Structures are given as C-alpha cells and as structure tokens.
C-alpha cells in the first residue's frame, strides 16, 4: 500500500511541481527579455539625449566663433551666456547614466540654450526623427 500511496502523491503533487517549474522557466525567460528590452530602451533614450546635447554644443561653438570678434555690450552679454552654456555642456556627465541629477542638469542646459536663442532672436526647432536630428530656424 505504501508504493501505491507514492504513486498517488506523485500524481497529486504533479500540478504543484509543474506550476513551480513553469514559474521558474517563465521568470528566467522574462528576465532575459526584460534585460534586452531595457538595453534597447536605454540605448535609444541615451542616443536622443546625446544627439540633443551634441546639437547644442555644435550650435554654441558656431556662435562662439561668430561672436568672437564682436565687442559691443550686447554681444558681451551674449558671450557670457554662451560661455555658461558651453561650460554646462562640458560638465554634463555623458558616461554616468546613474548620475542622480542628470535630468535636472539637462533641463538647465535646455533653459540656458533657450536663453541664448532669445538673446540672438532666433526660434530654434530641435527635432529627432528617423532621418536624423537637428535644429532648424
């Protein structure tokens, strides 16, 4: 009778065993897919931020060259804001996605960029699309 009891236990416990095995397999597969999806999302988001910062940097360096020889007081104010923008861009932590003030610093750069554009009296339109990213005026 003890042998038949073991057979019934195996049958009764099969549901629990299969449930546990299914959970483990599903968890492992879900973890693997989650890592891949997270990496894809992080890469895309990081590329967008990098493209935006790079665009600001190129814009700032171009205007630095253009304003370098100007000596009016108005241009002096533009140069101060421009130097501040360039400094913020250069201090931005490109290689540390865990930096706790990353988005705060990015917002400050965006604000300084808007301030500089206002001084220049230009209306930038930053776009990220499948064809690439860039500024238009």
Curated annotation (Swiss-Prot):
A biological-process GO annotation: telomere maintenance
Phosphoprotein among keywords: yes
Free-text tissue specificity from the UniProt record: Widely expressed. Highly expressed in placenta, kidney and skeletal muscle.
Major localisation: nucleus
Leader sequence residues: none
Annotated Gene Ontology cellular component terms: nucleus
Modified residues (Phosphoserine): 4
Modified residues (N-acetylalanine): 2
InterPro entries named in the record: Essential_protein_Yae1_N, LTO1_adapter
Subcellular location: Nucleus
Spans annotated as deca-GX3 motif: 22-58
Family according to the record: Belongs to the LTO1 family.
Designated name of the protein: Protein LTO1 homolog
């Amino acid at each position: 009778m003890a042998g038949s009891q073991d057979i019934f236990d195996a049958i009764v416990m099969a549901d629990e065993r299969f449930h546990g095995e299914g959970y483990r397999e599903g968890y492992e597969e879900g973890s693997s897919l989650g890592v891949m999806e997270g990496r894809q999302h992080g890469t895309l988001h990081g590329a967008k931020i990098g493209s935006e910062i790079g665009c600001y940097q190129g814009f700032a360096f171009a205007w630095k060259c253009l304003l370098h020889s100007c000596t009016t007081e108005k241009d002096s104010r533009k140069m101060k804001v421009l130097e501040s923008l360039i400094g913020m861009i250069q201090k931005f932590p490109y290689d540390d996605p865990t930096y706790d003030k990353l988005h705060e610093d990015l917002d400050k750069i965006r604000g300084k960029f808007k301030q500089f554009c206002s001084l220049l009296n230009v209306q930038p339109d930053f776009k990220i699309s499948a064809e690439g990213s860039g500024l238009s005026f």
